[in-house]
């Protein structure tokens, strides 16, 4: 076992992922997740050296309480593992345009993360709790905490990509612009794709699709992001589990003026009751629309809208590649496992030279990576993401 390990914390809006990782080889000695935080059915699951554990947390447990449980009940299962920690890495959802790369956390960094809360009101406060607790639990590593931003990879976007057609002073004075999300994942699969395609990352041109409960797509030109689908917040873009993605903004005024809905009701509808959940009326789980695509109208309707939106973005982003599009990459829980989503999406893109290989597509699931198109097709690849490894490696590099 390496004596240089990194603790990675990823505090979501209602979840908390944690892992102790060897940043050199990616081995996870401990990993787990607390789910349904702030809800009656809060629970936590973890794997320590290959052994699986799970337990219920107190009803309504917060991030703070979940971190206390982890410190008291999980870390103490193997104290010698903690003695090998050299640094702590934190996934931070939004850093505005303050950060173009990962940074060691100090008071100024914390202040800027706090200043970004209006752009990620559910996530950044949870991220800050993780930082405060880590410094408290591991005082000897207080100066070895690193922030890795989901927005940083997208800071290479040119002005024509990140500006909205709104009064310019809204950007200058209020920071209203496109920021994107899932940048850590888009960065990882970009570099992995360059290896698989045997091409220097600074010459690779890709369209990367991170498809999970949240979803985003990025145009990668010469290894850098030049456009991405999520905007000021993670609500814009693709159809997602419970988020609408792109809509006509006037729908909001219609719901407010004509339907009499409050601003909070509209916000909840767009973020919690739309997307796959809204279209099916049953569930936000993509496996439902996969399993019932043939037999149920709601599933068929939903997957058709989902894949139409995704294909439309891929087609649009392909026009940004001045030279050649090397490949389309699928990652994230849906991107890595939903063969039917990949098939239906690529079937709409034959004009771009994509031809699905049914056997390869079906085989590339459940952690298996690889090419899913025919030999004479433009390549499409499945690459399982590994955000924790990126965070661990950035953390180790900055604190070495």
Curated annotation (Swiss-Prot):
Give the Enzyme Commission number. Answer: 2.7.2.1
For the keyword Repeat, the answer is: no
Active-site positions, per UniProt? Answer: 150 (proton donor/acceptor)
For the protein in the UniProt heading, the enzyme class is transferase
Which residues make up the binding site for ATP?
17, 210-214, 285-287, 333-337
Pull one GO CC term from this UniProt entry.
Answer: cytosol
Q: Which UniProt keywords apply?
A: ATP-binding, Cytoplasm, Kinase, Magnesium, Metal-binding, Nucleotide-binding, Transferase
The record's GO molecular-function terms, alphabetically, read:
acetate kinase activity; ATP binding; magnesium ion binding
Can you cite a GO biological process for this protein? acetyl-CoA biosynthetic process
For site (Transition state stabilizer), what residue positions does UniProt give? 182, 243
> Which compartments does it reside in?
Cytoplasm
What superkingdom heads the lineage?
Answer: Bacteria
Its needed co-factors are: Mg(2+); Mn(2+)
Which residues make up the binding site for substrate?
91
- Which residues does Mg(2+) bind? 10, 387
Pfam families reported for this sequence? Acetate_kinase (PF00871)
Under Gene3D superfamilies, the record lists: 3.30.420.40
Q: Which reaction does it catalyse?
A: acetate + ATP = acetyl phosphate + ADP
Task: State how the cofactor is bound.
Answer: Mg(2+). Can also accept Mn(2+).
UniProt lists the family membership as follows:
Belongs to the acetokinase family.
Oligomeric and partner information: Homodimer.
Role played: Catalyzes the formation of acetyl phosphate from acetate and ATP. Can also catalyze the reverse reaction.
Q: Which NCBIfam families match?
A: ackA
Protein's name according to its UniProt entry: Acetate kinase
Lineage at the top is: Bacteria, Pseudomonadati, Pseudomonadota, Gammaproteobacteria, Candidatus Palibaumannia
């Amino acid at each position: 076992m390496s004596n240089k390990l990194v603790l990675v914390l990823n505090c979501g809006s209602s979840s908390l992922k944690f892992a102790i990782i060897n940043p050199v080889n990616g081995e996870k000695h401990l990993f787990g997740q607390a789910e349904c935080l702030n809800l009656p059915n809060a629970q936590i699951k973890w794997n320590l050296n290959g052994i699986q554990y799970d337990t219920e947390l107190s009803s309504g447990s917060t991030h703070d309480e979940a971190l206390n449980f982890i410190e008291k009940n999980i870390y103490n299962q193997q104290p010698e593992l903690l003695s090998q920690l050299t640094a702590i890495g934190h996934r931070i959802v939004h850093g505005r345009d303050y950060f173009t790369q990962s940074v060691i956390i100090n008071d100024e960094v914390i202040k800027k993360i706090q200043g970004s809360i209006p752009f990620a009101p559910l996530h950044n406060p949870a991220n800050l709790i993780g930082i405060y607790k880590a410094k408290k639990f591991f005082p000897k590593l207080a100066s070895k905490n690193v922030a890795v931003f989901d927005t940083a990879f997208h800071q290479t976007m040119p002005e024509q990509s990140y500006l909205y057609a709104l009064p310019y002073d809204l950007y200058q004075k209020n920071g209203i612009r496109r920021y994107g999300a899932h940048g850590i994942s888009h960065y990882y699969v970009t570099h992995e794709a360059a290896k698989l395609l045997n091409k220097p990352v600074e010459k690779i041109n890709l369209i990367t699709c991170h498809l999970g409960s949240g979803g985003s797509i990025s145009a990668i030109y010469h290894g850098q992001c030049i456009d991405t689908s999520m905007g000021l917040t993670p609500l814009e873009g693709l159809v997602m589990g419970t988020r609408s993605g792109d809509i006509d903004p006037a729908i909001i005024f219609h719901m407010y003026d004509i339907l009499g809905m409050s601003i909070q009701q509209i916000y909840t509808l767009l973020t919690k009751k739309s997307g796959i959940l809204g279209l099916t009326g049953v569930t936000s789980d993509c496996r439902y629309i996969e399993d019932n695509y043939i037999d149920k109208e709601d599933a068929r309707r939903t997957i058709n809208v989902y894949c139409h939106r995704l294909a439309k973005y891929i087609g649009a982003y392909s026009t940004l590649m001045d030279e050649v599009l090397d490949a389309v990459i699928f990652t994230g829980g849906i991107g890595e496992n939903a063969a039917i989503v990949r098939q239906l999406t690529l079937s709409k893109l034959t004009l771009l030279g994509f031809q699905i290989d049914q056997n390869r597509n079906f085989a590339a699931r459940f952690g298996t990576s690889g090419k899913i198109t025919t030999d004479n097709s433009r390549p499409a690849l499945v690459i399982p993401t590994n955000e924790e490894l990126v965070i661990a490696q950035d953390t180790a590099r900055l604190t070495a």
